[in-house]
């Protein structure tokens, strides 16, 4: 047992002993995530992705979930400060190709994010699908952080969207993070996904490896699980790009986020390549400017 994990065990015992149920649960979650890190050390340290990540997915009935576990080369304080803000989440979510707009606001039920999802190319905001995410900060302690986004309805009969982030500090410079992206679908969503997988998504694959071919090359997850892994990976890369850009002067951070996110996706062309860099950069600059103008 590591020293930090041992300290966490002592803290959970103290919290539970004095009846602090919420702290008890939070400490329990922290221990669970640290245990997951220990279990995944081999995969995190030795993989084909050129970074310390582990990606998996599940499908249960009409529900899909993609999971990314990653070691972030940033202090825990930077990660938690960035991910506890709904406004920062909009700066993160706007980076993937098909996000057209994001606006953080406060409603009767708390903070929410109005996100427009559409084509991977330039598109008017009003033509993109609206997802209304409720934002909830679950935990923020020196040993554990968790926040969640949830949307009841999505485009084309999809539903129950969830983006969840949890993190624990590994040392003064590194953080272990778990990102999960999940949604459910009905008949309309199933048909739309089948059309996508038979056309523009036919050659796409995911990131988890299901075996090796006759030449010893990895066989990657395909189908709907491959698709949900790609989306989860895009969001992870967006978080990493946002955290990296904090090293730059404020006026340069937007362009650095855009450049960093695209360059990262190009490391995985079979999974994530959608357009050339000049087209992506121009599109995102326009979308962010449009987003900033609309929020004024």
Residue ranges of predicted features:
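Bacterial N-terminal signal peptides that target proteins for export
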Residues: 2-16
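N-terminal signal peptide c-region/cleavage motif recognized by signal peptidases
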Residues: 22-26
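Terminal "cap-and-tail" regions of soluble proteins that handle hydrophobic small molecules
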Residues: 28-49, 53-54, 69, 152-154, ...
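Envelope-exposed proteins and targeting segments
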Residues: 51, 64-68, 78, 111, ...
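Terminal, regulation- and interaction-focused segments at domain boundaries
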Residues: 55-82, 104, 220-227
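Amphipathic alpha-helical segments
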Residues: 72-98
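A short, structured loop/turn motif at beta-sheet edges
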Residues: 73, 106-109, 135-144, 166-176, ...
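Glycine-rich portal/gate segments that line the openings of hydrophobic small-molecule binding cavities
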Residues: 98-162, 184, 242, 265, ...
């Amino acid at each position: 047992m590591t020293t930090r994990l041992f300290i966490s065990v002592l803290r959970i015992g103290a919290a539970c002993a004095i009846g602090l149920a919420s702290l008890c649960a939070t400490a329990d979650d922290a221990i669970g995530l640290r245990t997951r890190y220990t279990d995944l050390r081999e995969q995190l340290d030795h993989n084909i992705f050129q970074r310390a990540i582990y990606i998996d997915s599940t499908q249960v009935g009409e529900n899909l979930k993609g999971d990314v576990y990653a070691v972030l080369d940033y202090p825990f304080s930077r990660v938690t400060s960035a991910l506890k803000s709904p406004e920062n989440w909009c700066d993160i979510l706007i980076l993937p190709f098909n996000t057209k707009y994001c606006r953080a606001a406060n409603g009767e039920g708390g903070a929410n994010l109005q996100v427009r999802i559409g084509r991977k190319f330039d598109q008017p905001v009003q033509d993109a699908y609206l997802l209304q995410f409720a934002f909830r900060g679950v935990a923020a302690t020196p040993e554990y952080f968790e926040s969640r986004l949830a949307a009841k309805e999505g485009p084309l009969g999809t539903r129950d969207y969830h983006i969840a982030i949890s993190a624990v500090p590994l040392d003064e410079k590194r953080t272990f993070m778990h990102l999960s992206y999940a949604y459910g679908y009905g008949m309309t969503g199933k048909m739309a996904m089948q059309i996508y997988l038979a056309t523009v998504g036919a050659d796409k694959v995911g990131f988890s490896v299901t075996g090796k071919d006759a030449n010893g090359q990895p066989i990657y997850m395909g189908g709907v699980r491959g698709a949900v892994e790609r989306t989860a990976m895009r969001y992870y890369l967006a978080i990493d790009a946002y955290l990296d850009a904090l090293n730059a002067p404020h006026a340069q951070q937007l362009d650095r986020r855009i450049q960093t996110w695209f360059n990262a996706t190009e490391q995985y062309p079979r999974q994530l390549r959608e357009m050339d860099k000049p087209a992506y950069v121009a599109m995102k600059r326009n979308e962010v400017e449009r987003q900033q103008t609309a929020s004024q």
